[in-house]
A protein has these predicted regions:
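Mature extracytoplasmic/periplasmic domains
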Residues: 290-351
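C-terminal motif of bacterial Sec signal peptides marking the signal peptidase cleavage site
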Residues: 18-21
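A ligand-binding cleft/hinge motif common to bilobed small-molecule-binding domains
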Residues: 102-105, 247-268
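Extracytoplasmic ligand-binding site segments that recognize negatively charged/polar headgroups
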Residues: 50, 92, 97-242, 258
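Periplasmic-binding protein-like
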Residues: 125, 214-222, 229, 267-291
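A bilobed periplasmic-binding-protein/Venus flytrap-type ligand-binding module shared by bacterial periplasmic
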Residues: 153-158, 201-203, 283-295, 314
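Early extracytoplasmic/lumenal segment of secretory-pathway proteins
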Residues: 23-25, 30-106
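Conserved C-terminal helix/tail region of periplasmic/extracytoplasmic solute-binding proteins
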Residues: 238, 346-376
Length: 376
């Protein structure tokens, strides 16, 4: 897919982070960087551990030219894979791009180098509302890179025909509404995302740790489930763009791609993404430096380079992602910037919530409830 693979974010993150082996096929070790030169600019090899298709090729080429460097990318498909690989002993990565709740795990485990902010003058370009988070006060370890929202995407033609207003979570969770398009709804195969959506629908903080709240959310999901066709995190872009599915809970970047694909196929509908009236989950990916980084000087140079407005804008133009960089906005294509599910107004932005890492007891309870839901 064009965007990075959707994430089933950290259902058992600490357990995965502490494993000693993950059973995956070994990837080549990160490239070794030659000794730094005496030039004022750092150079050598930058080992980047990133989501697939999550940096524009022209951005990489420009960085390599400016610094006389070589960027070697290794990819992960979700945060669990990345955490498991690092927990199993993988080293040699300079910059890694974890989502915020995976970042929280890495900080707690002591896996990251503190940033030298004197080497990051472009921090001034960042949007204040995405900085200084509860899990990384003062951005000691991280700089936000890009973000997506977990929202509702829909086929505008089919929703109009069904008489459904898809701008609220009622479209997914109220059986009287959702079953109007029974069999044509797909939701992410992720307890993080589905429970969070149910919490927001019920007016509950998605970071709740209350057992009663989890039981209420599970009941709401169970009541709506007969109206849904599938739990799907892998192929819903295609299902929407082909017209098989009409309504979905998914990622804003994926709905952007689904609409591009529908237009390319000359479909007579659009795939529209909306932030539900009740609010939504915000997933921020961050740039960090691993404790084993062989070239921390070049890592700092790369992070600072990526905070320049034009460089930051190129990812948004490539995949339709949200952008944490205020200086990038002037370089983002108008059709991307017009996507209100990615670039909402200030009032809507206040309704977005980042997920925190759940305590172990709540992870176990949620896992049990999720199993009950799936086998219902």
């Amino acid at each position: 897919m064009t965007a990075h693979t959707p994430r089933a974010l950290l259902a058992a993150a600490l357990c995965i982070a502490l494993v000693t082996a993950c059973g995956k096929k070994e990837e080549p070790a990160p490239a070794k960087s030659p000794p730094p030169t005496s030039d004022s600019k750092p150079s050598g090899t930058l080992n980047l551990y990133n989501w697939n298709n999550y940096i524009a090729p022209e951005t990489v080429a420009r960085f390599e030219k400016e610094f006389g460097a070589k960027v070697v990318q290794t990819y992960f498909s979700d945060n669990e894979e990345m955490l498991a690989k690092l927990a199993a002993g993988a080293t040699g990565y300079d910059v890694i791009v974890p989502t915020s709740n995976a970042l929280e795990v890495l900080i707690k485990k002591g896996d990251l180098q503190p940033l030298d902010q004197t080497k990051l003058p472009n921090l001034k370009n960042m949007k204040p509302e995405l900085m200084n988070t509860a899990f990384d006060p003062g951005n000691k370890y991280s700089v936000p890179y890009a973000y997506s929202t977990t929202v509702i995407g829909f086929n505008d033609k089919r929703m109009k025909e069904a008489g459904i207003d898809p701008r609220g979570f009622e479209a997914l969770f109220d059986p009287k509404v959702a079953c109007k398009v029974k069999g044509h709804i797909t939701v992410l195969d992720s307890p993080d995302e589905v429970f969070s959506a149910a919490f927001i629908y019920l007016g509950i903080d998605p970071n709740t740790t209350s057992s009663d709240d989890y039981k209420r959310a599970a009941e709401a999901i169970k009541k709506a489930k007969p109206c849904w066709a599938a739990f799907n995190s892998s192929s819903y872009i295609k299902e929407l763009s082909s017209g098989n599915m009409w309504l979905a809970l998914g990622y804003s970047v994926d709905f952007f791609q689904a609409n591009v694909d529908a237009a390319a196929a000359k479909q007579d509908f659009k795939i529209v993404a909306v932030i539900p009236s009740q609010g939504a989950v915000l997933s921020v990916d961050n740039m960090v430096i691993h404790k084993s980084a062989p070239n921390p000087a070049l890592a700092h140079a790369f992070i600072n380079f990526m905070m320049e407005g034009q460089n930051a804008a190129e990812l948004s133009n490539l995949i339709g992602s949200g952008n944490a960089n205020a200086a990038a906005m002037q370089f983002i294509k108008p059709e991307v910037k017009a996507n209100v599910s990615v670039f909402p107004d200030a009032e809507t932005m206040k309704k977005l919530r980042q997920l925190r890492l759940l305590p172990a007891e709540q992870r176990r309870e949620r896992g049990q409830l999720w199993t009950e839901i799936k086998v219902q």
